[in-house]
Amino acid sequence: MHSVETFNLPALNSLLETTARRFGNRLAVQDDNGSLTFADFVEKVGILSAKLRLVIKRGEHVAVQLPRGINYIVAAYAIWEAGGVYLPLDNQWPSSRIEGILHRSHVRVLIHTSQADQGLELTELPAETRAESPVAGTPAYIIHTSGTTGEPKGVVVSHESLIHLVESHQRDIYQAYDVTEGPVAINASFCFDSALERMALVALGYSLHVVSDQVRKSPYELVKYLRDNSIVNVDLVPSHLKVLLSAGLNEKCDALRLVIVGGEAIDAELWREIVQNQAIYINVYGPTENTINTSFCEIRGETPHIGRPFKNVTCLLLNENGERCAAGEEGELLVAGRHLAQGYYNAPDLTDRVFVHIDGIRYYRTGDRVRQNEQGNLLYLGRIDDQVKINGFRIELADVQHNLTQLPGVKYAAVTPIKLPTGQGLLASIVWNSDAPEQTFSNLEALLGEKLPSYMVPTRWQKLDALPLTDNLKLDHKSLLSHWKNSQEQIGEKFAAESISATEHQIKNLWQKILRQPSLSPDAHFFASGGDSMAAMTLLVELKKVTPQDVSLGDIFKYPTIRKMAAWLDASSVQAES
């Protein structure tokens, strides 16, 4: 314990107190377990903040590992009020990853759920020497993203940058499109940077509904939730939005006026589908290193783009020679301005490498290839490196590759991005060590899942005698993809003539379409065949169209093969008729 410091409240906390004085009895936050008015919310924040002030000093890191709900938001505001730095953790992450982040980030206190009464509990962690912030300014939070070394890197963002982002959204989006009140929803993971923008809406007086994990994973339940709670504004990644549109998002949610779409690129097909809807859809783009969002646009017209920068953001395009791009020339996007993050925690070399000074201005090198069209909008063209995005999460291929090569029996490994109907996926190509027994791909998947979050684990696997190289002796990703495609066609020929029932045939066709597999055995396992959470949600939507049986996400786990699911559906149909 130490003497309690005094200091001015961060801007968001000051806004929250002003809002609470104006709208004390108005709903502030709600989840499946209850709700809090603004008066109650501020009181709960104050109680937790007082406890934190007794054990932390200003600028110390406080990690939050809680079930999804109101308490995550309470914890963030309490940490800021106490002068701490908010560091969210995901309960779904492997324990080794969480322990590594706690250690490398020099976390002082962990906020978690009490086993005794399910309330909030503070656990002090061993005190260690803490690195200074990368640049001057008071840090607000640290968000971890995939790193090239096999360990996640922590992006440090200041209170100043966060409040500038909040002001940009309020001015350029919510006020500009006249969506300044009404219930709003947070769909993003609390470990995803866009969750901070959602959480900030509470300070601005919006009533924030926290969508539960169960509802988030069921397209029809989520659409029903948005409809029943008259949600006017929600955040979605494109791959999730695609599934929800198929589940009737536009037709069933009359109150929905504004959808914030971000986290990954929107393809032309989805863009055209969005244009036909009644609600306003805003495409937001930006790296975590520029405080969530850099540019935005309303989704309309024929060609996908990422719009123009917010008013307090500066963009610069450089070609391969490091020169400013001519009009219409593609190049790497660099961003500067008031949204810019402080850098990476305890990684000065990496910070200096990507946060650069040009003509006296500090820029972040995004690694994104863009081009500016004649209308002044930025067109996203891809990456200049090996970074990909899956369901909105950034993944460095080197991170996955490094962890793969640490697994028993693996001599060499390559990870290649692969386009799937549900979005981006990963293909793992493995060369076995001849001196060690071979592992099954299921075993490797399980072992990798102990080190990495599920969204970083490849869903496609293949065994090779050697990794193919180009003439320049670089890894040949095209050959890896070609080899995998050819092997899948051979599997398809093997099972094409297999005798199956009518229901099995129907399900088989759905699986092949969703998983983009030429053919599947009746005993093929949905998740072992490349299925992931987004593919499972797509399957729920497609099954709803062809069967009267209510199918949940749990049913896909319970009946994970074509044969088992068909037998269950047939048995359920017989029971319904009798």
From Swiss-Prot:
Carrier domain span: 498-573
Pathway it works in: Antibiotic biosynthesis
GO biological process: amino acid activation for nonribosomal peptide biosynthetic process; antibiotic biosynthetic process; secondary metabolite biosynthetic process
Annotated coiled-coil segments of the chain: none
KW Phosphoprotein (keyword) present: yes
Gene3D superfamilies membership: 3.30.300.30, ACP-like, N-terminal domain of ligase-like
PROSITE patterns: AMP_BINDING (PS00455), CARRIER (PS50075), PHOSPHOPANTETHEINE (PS00012)
Necessary cofactors: pantetheine 4'-phosphate
SMART domains to which the protein is assigned, alphabetical: PKS_PP
PTM annotation (O-(pantetheine 4'-phosphoryl)serine): residues: S533
KW Phosphoprotein (keyword) present: yes
Molecular function, one GO term: phosphopantetheine binding
An annotated GO cellular component: cytoplasm
Keywords in alphabetical order: Antibiotic biosynthesis, Phosphopantetheine, Phosphoprotein
Domain of life (superkingdom): Bacteria
UniProt cross-references to PANTHER family, sorted A to Z: FATTY ACID SYNTHASE, NONRIBOSOMAL PEPTIDE SYNTHETASE
Similarity remark: Belongs to the ATP-dependent AMP-binding enzyme family.
Protein role: Involved in dapdiamide antibiotics biosynthesis. Activates and sequesters N-beta-fumaramoyl-DAP as a covalently tethered thioester for subsequent oxidative modification of the fumaramoyl group.
Protein name: Dapdiamide synthesis protein DdaD
Species of origin: Enterobacter agglomerans (Erwinia herbicola)
Lineage of source species: Bacteria, Pseudomonadati, Pseudomonadota, Gammaproteobacteria, Enterobacterales
Gene: ddaD
